Amino acid sequence: MINFLTLSEVLQILENQVRNYGGAYGVRDMHLLSSAVYMPESSFGGNYLHETIPAMAAAYAYHLCQNHPFIDGNKRAALASSLVFLDLNGYEFECDDDVLYEKIMDVAKGEVKKEELIKFYEKYSRER
């Protein structure tokens, strides 16, 4: 069984990021937030559109970052949500912090397509 994140959990992740690193807490657009949070569990014909746990984690990172649903902390919440999702599903993510930072910044700038981010997550994610 896959442990998907709920809206409430993503909001808790944002709150934690803002509390620890600063910024303003709040949702700019609840519809964009809902869209991003539920994207990883989207399916068609009984099959998930994102077929692997790392691909689903990448979908959290990509859509939360691109949808920009929060007042502040979008990149931090996107990254943290993806890593929490991996952890909840028995995966670890091992990547140099600088490489990860650059990748998330590139996603935010629109320079990385979702397929590329999925490959990135598949490269650095391992089952525990």
Regions found by a protein language model. Name each.
Residues 1-128:
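FIC/Doc superfamily catalytic core
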